[in-house]
Structures are given as C-alpha cells and as structure tokens.
Amino acid sequence: MKKFIVLIYGIIAYLVFLISFLYAMAFVGNFLVPKTINSATESTGISAVIINLLLLSLFAIQHSIMARPAFKAWWIKIIGKPAERSTYILLSSLALLLLFWKWQPINTVVWEIDNSLFVWIIIGVAALGWLIVLLST
C-alpha cells in the first residue's frame, strides 16, 4: 500500500511539473497564457522589480537548497528515499507556479534583438534549454 501511495504521489508531482513546465514555456515565450513575462499594460516601477527579484530568489533558494546532498540526506530521513525526488519536483514546480501567479510585468524594454539571424539563434538556444530541462527530469 505504501508503494502505491508513493507511486500516486510521484505521478501527481510529475503532473504538476508538466503543468508548470508548459506554463513556463508560454510565460517566457509570451503566448497562450493570460499573464506573461512581457504582459505589462502600464509602467509598474521599482516595486515590480523588487517583487520579481523576491520571487526569483524564492525559487532559486528553494531549488538550490533542496538539491544539496546534505539537505537530501536530512530530508530522506523525514520523508523516505522513494518520495524524495517527487517532493523536490513538486515543491520546485509549486514555487515556479507561485512566481508566474505573482509576477509583476514591467513595461520597459530590457533587451531587444532586431537582427533576424540572432533572433533565430536565440530561439534555437531557448528550445535547446527547454529540451535539456525536460530531459533532466
């Protein structure tokens, strides 16, 4: 019974990951979702920058701490080895979904590429990055 519960937990964790992964692609790619990284309609100012930095920091800190061997060893004692990876995936995905939900788009161009060759290079590098993230799970 315990193995079955851990299996269901793992499936749920990976479904949440899949949702956050697909949403991340749309959020960063500026398509298909109601709020994207670039969807500001008015100037939002320094408060948006601070909120966004805090959201990014929360994700980065959670993601980095839980990946450390010392934390994993401690965490496995609490939840068990079979559920460790699923918990890491679930909490990282939830932190990312929180980032999307609370993100404050900024109505300022941070960078822009006009050369079509460089645009395609950036798109290719981005696609490779998404593929690496997907395959690393």
Task: Write out the residue ranges for each language-model feature.
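Membrane-anchoring alpha-helices and their flanking helix-loop junctions
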Residues: 1-137
